[in-house]
Regions:
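Conserved active-site and SAM-binding loop architecture
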Residues: 1-207
Length: 207
C-alpha cells in the first residue's frame, strides 16, 4: 500500500498497525517521531505506476511488483476553491498562478490514474476553473469522534465511501494559524477508520 504525499505517516501507521505493508512518500522527510523505514523521500510520480524499486528514508532498498492500494493527498494550494480569489488581481488573470494550477491539476490526474486496483485521492473542494472530475464522496473528521469539522472530498476507484462511526456531539470548524502540511494532516481517528474500513473491504473483495 502506498500513501502518496504524506509526511505525517498518519495513514501509513494506521495500515501498519493492522499488519499491512504500507509506505508513505513525500518530498519532505517523515516528521519527527515517524518511522523512516516506512517512508520514501522524493517524487512519488514514478511510484504511481507500480512495479517499482525505491530506497526508504532509512536507506533500505525495496521492490514492489504492484500496489494493491494507493491513497494520494496531492497539494491543494493551487486547486482549492478558497484560493480562487488569488487567480485574478484587479480583474487580470495572474498567469504564474494559472500555470501552477495547470501543473497541480496534471499531478492530481496522475494520482487518479495511478496503476492500482484500488485508488483514493483526497482534496478539499476544488475551484471550478480546475475542471476536476466529480468527487465520489466527502467526509468530516467529526464523524469519527474528532471535535473539528473539515470537509474533505474523495475521488475513489473500486472503493466504497468511508462510513461514519462516532459522531462528535458539538464539533467546531478546524481553524489554525498554521498552514500547509500541518493543516492538511489526516486526523488519527480518520486515518484509523480509513485503514480499518478499506483494508477489510479489499481483503473481502480479493477472496
Amino acid at each position: 500500500m502506498l500513501i502518496a504525499c504524506e509526511e505525517s505517516q498518519a495513514e501509513c501507521a494506521a495500515f501498519r498497525a493492522l499488519g499491512h505493508i504500507a509506505y508513505s512518500c513525500d518530498i519532505q522527510p517523515c516528521r519527527p517521531g515517524g518511522n523512516p523505514y516506512w517512508h520514501i523521500q522524493g517524487d512519488v510520480t514514478p511510484l504511481l505506476k507500480g512495479d517499482t524499486a525505491f530506497v526508504t528514508q532509512a536507506g533500505f532498498l525495496r521492490t514492489v511488483p504492484r500496489w494493491d492500494l494507493i491513497i494520494c493527498h496531492p497539494p491543494c494550494t493551487y486547486l482549492c476553491k478558497v484560493s480562487s480569489v488569488h487567480m485574478k488581481i484587479g480583474g487580470r488573470i495572474q498567469w504564474p498562478r494559472l500555470r501552477n494550477m495547470i501543473l497541480a491539476r496534471r499531478f492530481f490526474m496522475q494520482c487518479i490514474n495511478a496503476e492500482a486496483k484500488y485508488v483514493a485521492v483526497e482534496n478539499p473542494l476544488p475551484m471550478a476553473r480546475a475542471h476536476l472530475p466529480q468527487p465520489s464522496c466527502f467526509v468530516q473528521p467529526s464523524w469519527f469522534g474528532v471535535k473539528y469539522t473539515k470537509k474533505t472530498l474523495y475521488w475513489l476507484k473500486n472503493l466504497p465511501p468511508i462510513m461514519p462511526q462516532l459522531e462528535h456531539p458539538n464539533p467546531r470548524c478546524f481553524v489554525t494559524a498554521s498552514r500547509g502540511k500541518y493543516r492538511s494532516r489526516t486526523f488519527p481517528e480518520l486515518a484509523h477508520a480509513i485503514a480499518t474500513q478499506w483494508s477489510q473491504y479489499i481483503l473481502d473483495d480479493m477472496k
